[in-house]
């Protein structure tokens, strides 16, 4: 059964030689337990620069999978200490990304929970920076 939730999302992206970029967003979403894991989904907005995109965090016992569909498509797999390649599809083309979670913690219950994720990102095989996400999930 899907549960309506409120998501508080804070993302901090630090790229080599640049000031960190911080995005904070509070938005409505849905949460559902299925096939042994949690799916937490929401619609992106102009604020994130990803209008027309649906983002889903799939939380499984030892990993989190971030999937984006719509105006752009991507799937990134996060397991602590494991490097994962993914293709990031955008309207003007695709890029190869490699992500590696350096920190991954989550605690999800039917009432909500949280996800803390820190990962390094390589773009086209070149080290690009570090991304830090924190999601608070609250059932409505």
Task: Label each region the model flagged.
Residues 1-123, 128, 140:
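N-terminal intrinsically disordered, cationic/polar leader segments
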Residues 131:
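Charged phosphate-binding loop/patch that engages nucleotide di/tri-phosphates or the phosphate backbone
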Residues 134-140:
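Flexible glycine-rich active-site/ligand-binding loops centered on an Asp-His dyad
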